């Protein structure tokens, strides 16, 4: 989807052709993003389910670089772990890989947090 959602209010957005292809939960995530003045064009895409949209929205709300995980190849659990690593100021390149499942990502994040705390 192009950046057609920027500068639109919710009423105008609901009238767009592309908006009707989203399910109720996806539409809600888009509405919340518009209300919070986020760039919903980043996640208002058919390839993201509502849970993935939510993780991306949370990252946008926290001014994180969501480009690291705003990819449909990541499931929402993986997105959560990458977002948490960004929030913890850890090196996301270590495990922001689709071949790692969310449990492996969580374990890696835990090890990195432990190392970080012992260095302080």
Segments from the language model and where they lie:
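General marker for long, soluble alpha-helical cores
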Residues: 1-120
